[in-house]
């Protein structure tokens, strides 16, 4: 199991395809599996790998809570497609040009002609299969918790500020006020986003910019549509 080399373009493509129908590396909530792969990736994937980028931005929003996420962090070879070997950090690509792609992680310095032919054939089949997939617009449903400073905050004005945020690929949905204690209520608001256009980081940055009303914003739920 694995994703190949997550520091390479080929490895990120494997991760992107793996996440095409998944919100998380394992299960239905963020876990230590996501943290292990997130740390191995190390930087946001390219914009054209929108499944991987959507996942990366979502897991990044759990930076402060990552130690408390469920599960046990395992080796990268314990995650991902069963037919791909993990080679991240193995040094297999250190002596190669960045353009060299080793999707299936050969350990031999000198590949036989037959092994090279088979590897290139499998890579071509992989690229062909991916190219035939229809270009779908990936969307996610996000539930946000927006917390005010205190019980005197004008929550109607706070919601008005949040809904004033407009972006291509962002649609606001229903909302409600939820008591959190000491007379304070938080705004819980639903939105649907196009993953390659709107991320949780962007939403947090713009919502918390209304600092007269907003103390913080958290992602309460994130589901791929």
UniProtKB/Swiss-Prot annotation:
Q: Which UniProt keywords apply?
A: Elongation factor, Phosphoprotein, Protein biosynthesis
Q: Where is the region Disordered?
A: 80-114
A biological process term (GO) from this entry: translational elongation
Q: How is it modified after translation?
A: Phosphorylation affects the GDP/GTP exchange rate.
For bias type Acidic residues, the affected ranges are 96-113
Superkingdom classification of source: Eukaryota
Q: Which Gene3D superfamilies match?
A: 1.20.1050.130, 3.30.70.60
**Could you give one GO CC term from the UniProt record?**
cytosol
Where is each GST C-terminal domain found?
Answer: 2-84
Phosphoserine (modified residue): where?
Answer: 106
Pfam family, any one? EF-1_beta_acid
Q: Name one GO molecular function term.
A: translation elongation factor activity
State if Phosphoprotein is listed as a keyword: yes
What function does this protein fulfil? Catalytic subunit of the guanine nucleotide exchange factor (GEF) (eEF1B subcomplex) of the eukaryotic elongation factor 1 complex (eEF1). Stimulates the exchange of GDP for GTP on elongation factor 1A (eEF1A), probably by displacing GDP from the nucleotide binding pocket in eEF1A.
Description of how the protein assembles with itself and partners: EF-1 is composed of 4 subunits: alpha, beta (alpha subunit of the eEF1B subcomplex), delta (beta subunit of the eEF1B subcomplex), and gamma (gamma subunit of the eEF1B subcomplex). Interacts with elongation factor EEF1A1.
The family annotation for this protein states: Belongs to the EF-1-beta/EF-1-delta family.
The protein's name: Elongation factor 1-beta
Q: Taxonomy-wise, where does this protein's organism fall, top ranks first?
A: Eukaryota, Metazoa, Chordata, Craniata, Vertebrata
């Amino acid at each position: 199991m694995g994703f190949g080399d997550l520091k390479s373009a080929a490895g990120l493509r494997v991760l992107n395809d793996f996440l095409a129908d998944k919100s998380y590396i394992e299960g239905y909530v963020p876990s230590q599996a996501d943290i292990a792969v997130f740390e191995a990736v190390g930087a946001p994937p390219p914009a054209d790998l929108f499944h991987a980028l959507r996942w990366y931005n979502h897991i990044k929003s759990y930076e402060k809570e990552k130690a408390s996420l469920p599960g046990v962090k395992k080796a990268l070879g314990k995650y991902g497609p069963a037919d791909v070997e993990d080679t991240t950090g193995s040094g297999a690509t250190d002596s190669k040009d960045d353009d060299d792609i080793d999707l299936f992680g050969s350990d031999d310095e000198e590949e036989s002609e037959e092994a090279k032919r088979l590897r290139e054939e499998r890579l071509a089949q992989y690229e062909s299969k991916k190219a035939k997939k229809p270009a779908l617009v990936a969307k996610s449903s996000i539930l946000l918790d927006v917390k005010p400073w205190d019980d005197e905050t004008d929550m109607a004005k706070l919601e008005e500020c949040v809904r004033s945020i407009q972006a291509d690929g962002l649609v606001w949905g229903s909302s409600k006020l939820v008591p959190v204690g000491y007379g304070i209520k938080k705004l819980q608001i639903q939105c649907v986003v196009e993953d390659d256009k709107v991320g949780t980081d962007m939403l947090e940055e713009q919502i918390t910019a209304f600092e007269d009303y907003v103390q913080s914003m958290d992602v309460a739920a994130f589901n791929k549509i």
